[in-house]
Each structure stands twice: as C-alpha cells, then as structure tokens.
Swiss-Prot record:
Record's protein name: Peptide methionine sulfoxide reductase MsrA
EC top class named in words: oxidoreductase
Source organism of the structure: Pseudomonas syringae pv. tomato (strain ATCC BAA-871 / DC3000)
GO cellular component: cytoplasm
SUPFAM superfamilies: Peptide methionine sulfoxide reductase
Keyword Oxidoreductase: yes
Pfam families: PMSR
Residues annotated as the enzyme's active site: C58
GO biological process: cellular response to oxidative stress; protein modification process
Length: 215
C-alpha cells in the first residue's frame, strides 16, 4: 500500500479515501457572472442549457478553449473525481485529494452539440499520458470526461473508440481518459475562474496530438 508521505513525493498515485485530506463543508464563493461573456456563471439561465464536465490538464487553458466555442453559455473551473470536499488549490496540488482539474461547461444544445464538445476535448489535449498533461505532472492533470446523462456516457465512450482508432493509425498510444458518471464538482477559487482572460500572458500548457476526430 502506498503511504501518504509517498503520494506527496510521487504525484502519479491516487490516494485512498482514508488517505485523502478531510476538506471542509463550506464551498468556494464565486462571482455571479462570467468574466468573459457576462452571462450568469451558474444560472439562472434564460435559454435551454445542458451541462458537461471535462478534464484535459490545467484548467486555465482548458476553460479558455471551451468558452471560445459558439453555443457555450458559461464555464466554471473546478475539481472533481476525488474524495476531499471543497478542496483548496493547494490541497489539490498536494495529490492528497484525488481530484483532477475540470471545467464545468454550460451549453445550448441547439447551438453546439455534445458531440462537437467531445471533438474539441479530444483534439485539444493528449489523452494518452495518464497522470500528466505535457509538463504538468500529477493526478490533478489526468484526462477525464464526467457525464451528466446516460446519453453523454454512451456518446463519450463511442467517441473514445473512434479517437483511439485514429491515434493508433498515427502510431500513438492508448487512451487513459476516465469516462464515468459525473461526481460532485467542487468549484475552484475565484482567481482561477476565466484565468487566462484576466491574465492573457498566463501559463497555458494545453496541446493536442495533431490527430483529428472524424466528424
């Protein structure tokens, strides 16, 4: 069994529920509106919207890529997939929460389909790297699709099979992306929300494989 002290050194190992930090009951306080488009960050929304959750490395660049898509109403940076309730960024970086960095996407399905969002997801990062994304190493950077409906789950799995076929043709490895029913998403601190709009010269490690998902 991996010790807690070893996880602090080796960020590629997920903690157990017993090893995870305890967290807290109070969620992060968020601004009411999206910094980029002025829409409500979490609602209420005037249009028919659906929700999607993606993790593709550092959420700064991931969130920007997703808010740039026409039909996306709002995006929120957060943490999901682990054990610690309402973690801080520092706690997530320790490797002792089990969470990965994610983006909650609010979108209008009449303007952008879930399949279109999946295409953006697969092509924007390298989903074969396990507990890392480029130079960002650790469990918090693992690739995930957390699905809010059975239809999303089926579509995500089908798209993974299709993208794996294209990766294999290109001589690349196997997909390591977690595809699961959506767990609780804990919101990240305000300074992480729409970070690259507030800090245009900020770090962005987002980078794809050059492989495209067939339409």
């Amino acid at each position: 069994m991996t010790l807690r002290s070893e996880i602090l050194v080796n960020k590629n190992v997920l903690p157990t529920a017993e090893q995870a930090l305890p967290g807290r009951e109070t969620p992060m306080t968020l601004p009411e509106t999206h910094f980029v488009n002025g829409n409500p960050l979490l609602g209420p929304f005037t249009s028919n919207v659906e929700f999607a959750i993606f993790g593709l490395g550092c959420f700064w660049g991931a969130e920007r890529r997703l808010w740039q898509q026409e039909g996306v109403v709002s995006t929120v940076a957060g943490y999901a997939g682990g054990f610690t309730p309402n973690p801080t960024y520092e706690e997530v970086c320790s490797g002792l929460t089990g969470h990965t960095e994610v983006v909650l996407v609010v979108y209008e399905p009449e303007k952008i389909s879930y399949d279109s969002l999946l295409k953006v997801f697969w092509e924007a990062h390298n989903p074969t790297q396990g507990m890392r994304q480029g130079n960002d190493i650790g469990t918090q950077y693992r690739s995930v699709i957390y699905c809010t409906t059975p239809e999303q789950l089926a579509a995500a799995k089908a798209s993974a099979d299709a993208f794996q076929a294209e990766l294999s043709k290109a001589g690349l490895g196997g997909i390591t992306t977690e595809i699961e029913e959506a767990p609780t998403v804990y919101f990240a601190e305000t300074y992480h929300q729409q970070y690259l709009a507030k800090n245009p010269q900020g770090y962005c490690g987002l980078g794809g494989t050059g492989v495209c998902l067939p339409a």
